[in-house]
Amino acid sequence: VYVWRTRGVVMAALMGVGALGGLMMLPSRRQEMEVSEASAMGRVESWYEGIQMFIGSPVFGIGAGGYSDLHELTAHNSFVLVLAETGIVGFTVWLAIVGYCFRMMLAIVERGDDIIDDVPLEVPDEVALKDWKTDKALSLCLLLSLTGFFTAAFFLSRSYVVILYLLVALVVGHYTRMRATYPSLPVFSLEKDLIRWPSYAVIGVIGLYLTVKVLLAMA
């Protein structure tokens, strides 16, 4: 999250991939880090099967619950599962929901204390600043919760679990209240992002495909 906030998404992604590659090349007794280890290889093969299902039905996918009907294991990757079962259309929508949650919390966390100028003049500055610090801390907590959940979700099938959508509801509710209190916070609208999310979805598909190919080649 720190690298993402200070250096940007691309740098964070590159550092993440580099760190993963470095860990996998280090000699270690932690067998779960080895791609060639049986359970890890089974996980990668599950990702590969999900990609193949997507290639077979790229627009709307194979349908909810279809992955487990066609493969003996779960996808072990929430992104692959959504991609396989809902196609590029569903993946784009799901990615937009996730992406907006991150953008909302980042918009608050990255905002300076000058935002208290939005607060009515009758509220003392020290009170307004204290309330803003509390709201900002809560936003950071929600951002870290999102980060933790989706870090785990990359290795587990958690695409449809209720806890995800409760977390989404908390984030949206919190941002709605923050927008009412601090009107200078940005408004997020699909009308402004009609190109953004389909583009990110395509980039995500390519990234997943290349990741699987690299891991299979390393096995």
Predicted regions: what they are:
Residues 1-26, 197-206:
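Hydrophobic alpha-helical segments of polytopic membrane proteins
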Residues 51, 80, 84, 93, ...:
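Generic hydrophobic alpha-helical scaffold/packing signal
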Residues 37-94:
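TM-adjacent membrane-interface loops and short helices in multi-pass inner/ER membrane proteins
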Residues 1, 10-15, 91-96, 161-166:
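Transmembrane-embedded, aromatic-rich helix segments that form part
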